[in-house]
Amino acid sequence: PSLTITTIERDEKRYLEALKNIKKLKLEDRITLIFNDALDVSLSEKYDLIFIDAAKAQSIKFFEKFEKNLNPSGTIITDNLKFHGLVDKDEEEIESRNLRALVRKIKEYISFLKGNINYKTDFYELGDGISVSKRIEEK
């Protein structure tokens, strides 16, 4: 198959674990692993699928930064949109101020996805909640 993967990891421990797994499975020719913060990485390649599983407070930044790398009929998937069920709670129910701020950011991202006319986004209760945003091709 011609499938290739580019993945970005900023946590050194996770990066080294991924590197070990890629070598163990002999997938070095198919998986490119980048050790960096994704917001500091510039990619020129185009992708059919982009998967965002990163700092939840920055999901809009990740989406806007990497959508230029998405093929015209591509899809962006975002993980952990329920954030351990906290997104479904009223703000007053969340004791930590930092968690409230993070939940607010996730809710802003969900609104961003719902309002983005360039994508058809569906939300699923799978795991901790995911969104699947399919780019609407221009005619």
Regions found by a protein language model. Give the residues of each.
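S-adenosylmethionine/decaboxylated-SAM
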Residues: P1-K139
